[in-house]
Curated annotation (Swiss-Prot):
Entry function: PPIases accelerate the folding of proteins. It catalyzes the cis-trans isomerization of proline imidic peptide bonds in oligopeptides.
Subcellular location: Nucleus
GO MF entry, a single one: peptidyl-prolyl cis-trans isomerase activity
UniProt xrefs under Pfam families: Pro_isomerase, RRM_1
PANTHER family listed in its UniProt record: PEPTIDYL-PROLYL CIS-TRANS ISOMERASE-LIKE 4 (PTHR45843:SF1)
Organism: Emericella nidulans (strain FGSC A4 / ATCC 38163 / CBS 112.46 / NRRL 194 / M139) (Aspergillus nidulans)
Protein name (record): Peptidyl-prolyl cis-trans isomerase-like 4
Entry GO terms, CC: nucleus
Enzyme Commission number: 5.2.1.8
Amino acid sequence: MSVLLETSLGDIVIDLLVDESPKACENFLKLCKVKYYNFSPFYSVQKNFSFQTGDPIGPDSPDSNGGSSIWGLLEGPSKQAVPLALPPKLKHDEKGTVSMAAVPSPHDPDLRLVTSQFIVTLGDNLDYLDGKAVIFGKVVEGFDVLEKVNEAFIDDRGRPLKDIRIRHTVILDDPFDDPPGLVEPPESPLPTKAQLATVRIADDEDLGDDMDEASMEKLRREREARAQALTLEMVGDLPFAEVKPPENVLFVCKLNPVTQDEDLELIFSRFGKILSCEVIRDKRTGDSLQYAFIEFESQKDCEQAYFKMQGVLIDDHRIHVDFSQSVSKLSESWRDATVKKRSAQRGGFGGVAGLEKKRQYRASENARERANYNMVFDKNDNRRSAPRERSYSRSPQRNNYRDRRDSRSPRRDSYRSRYGDRSNSRSPPLRDRDRIRTDYYDNDRRRGYRDDDRYRDRRRR
């Protein structure tokens, strides 16, 4: 008992395990017989794991009901999902195992409710699916198709970007009798409007294989340019991806190193008013890099200068003139520098002319103020006019002490003239202290000698 699935990627032959899962095999065979699976999309593709199909419209469509069993089609919505028992001996241990997608039955935990959706494994030993899906068949032919499905480009929900669909189903052998009311269609039906609404890139759509090499190269360059522009926008080099270079700016190269901004502006000013003209120079040395940017007020003047000045001899050098879009990186850096210079000339802060930086953030003013710092002395300073003795000590602390001692205020000098240079301490001076200590010891010594004589006199008595 086998079924042939004709898909958009090739044919797949499935052998049905009728003895182990008779009810699931009957459901699958009869759905194939009524052409229920025609135009069903592949979805839930998980690389090296599995893919799912069997919903004729697809789970992304609001018109989808998730599929139906053959008995639901014949008897009504009450039989849309039928309970099936899990075959105990069958496991998802081989690539190409086919099983019915199922959910647990609310009435019996040993049963699973299935409709029309089925799963095909893309890897070996997928025990995660054991006990969750009802196995009913094995793929015996078409493993190359399984590999193509495994390598397909998919979105974040697992649906292939280019549709993979079941085109036809062919029953090779059917051992089951048809249920009452089943009528086999004479030919494969056309896709419904709901099915056609789910098409992304049709499985038979040509993606440019008939284009010539030149057209393919042009298309590739356009895509690469858009990708690069988007990258520059993300990193902040461009304000937006579709930005266009200015059309009133000329790029002039092959200049003589001695050519100055004023010379170039004078030569090009005969074509119209020039807003800015700058020879680009090395930031470190200031030497000319031998190219410049000239910004005209009008695009017409810029175009006229472009046609007239190409190959003109300036300072013994034949210059090359082009529009700035041919060297967009150089033009961008020059434009940023020009905007900064203009902003500095206009004044203001943050693009608003009325704003002004706080004083602590004005680097130039701070530097100017620090350069004008000076020592300030009191006009009534009565420092000693006598020459200071030269100190033979090299200690900076001693010099600082002498400076502090010599630089007395007038108030302190008047105090010293009134009371003298006497110390504020109540203790006697050092030399007086030594004399007092010596007299004290002498008195004790005399008193001791006197006491000893008295003691000897008592002994004699």
